[in-house]
Amino acid sequence: NLSNGDTVTVTAVYDDYLTETYGCIPESDTKTYTVEGLDSYMTSFDGLPDGALDEVHTDSRDRVESLIANKEQICGAFIDWSTDTPDTYQVDTQNLKLYTSYLLVSKGADFGAKYSNRYIAVYHTTGSMSKKSWFGDSYNGDMYIAVDYKDLKFDESGNLIVNLTDAEYTYFTTADNAYNYWMTSNKDCYKVFEQKAVAPAAAPAADAATADTAPAEASAS
């Protein structure tokens, strides 16, 4: 479990007979080495290079926009968990914004953390939708969609390495629910950090861009 900057001291053990026989005497019995060149996991928002998370934010926004275009999935998440086509569906895409980011840093495997870290980008917008259902038939209000990435790390050159193919989604109707799900409930096994982005977008104006055709918390592991 070494990290860059750690030091390792090596102590030589040798036989006096070999020294006497071959006339070799080491200049020193010990030598200290500094660890370098290792990848290191992201452990804080502090000191991040400018633009370090740009690729993640581009990917997460693309994913959220794609989800919004999939009206059956979004409507299922915010109404009844089914994939039936909604009767009406309207989500504000013009005011879709990154609302906040969470960083969960493992306290160690002994605490039950499955990953070294998790980065969650939470987006906010508003929407309204309806469909006939035994469980509920409509939703109109705030929508918080979170995209979760795992095991972010920096290479030797300081570039952030992220597996963009391994992302999961959770859906919330309030910012507090998103915070409690990701931050509060994970404090037993992760150190948690938040980096607020912007305030929630205002309700869409009459001429705001929307996902055409007329949300309930979701969960992810």
Residue ranges and their predicted role:
Residues 1-66:
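Beta-rich interaction/scaffold domains
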Residues 13-27, 126-144, 154-155:
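Short, cysteine-centered beta-strand-loop-beta hairpins and adjacent loop/turn segments enriched
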Residues 115-127:
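Short, hydrophobic/proline-enriched secondary-structure or compact coil segments at domain edges
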Residues 201-221:
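Ser/Thr/Gly/Pro-rich low-complexity, disordered linker/stalk segments of secreted
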Residues 86-91, 99, 106, 112, ...:
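Intrinsically disordered, low-complexity regulatory regions
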Residues 1-11, 101-114:
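Serine/threonine-rich, repeat-prone extracellular segments and beta-strand-based repeat modules
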Residues 46-92:
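Short, non-transmembrane alpha-helical segments in secretory-pathway proteins
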Residues 136-188, 198:
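A short, surface-exposed interaction/processing loop segment used at functional sites
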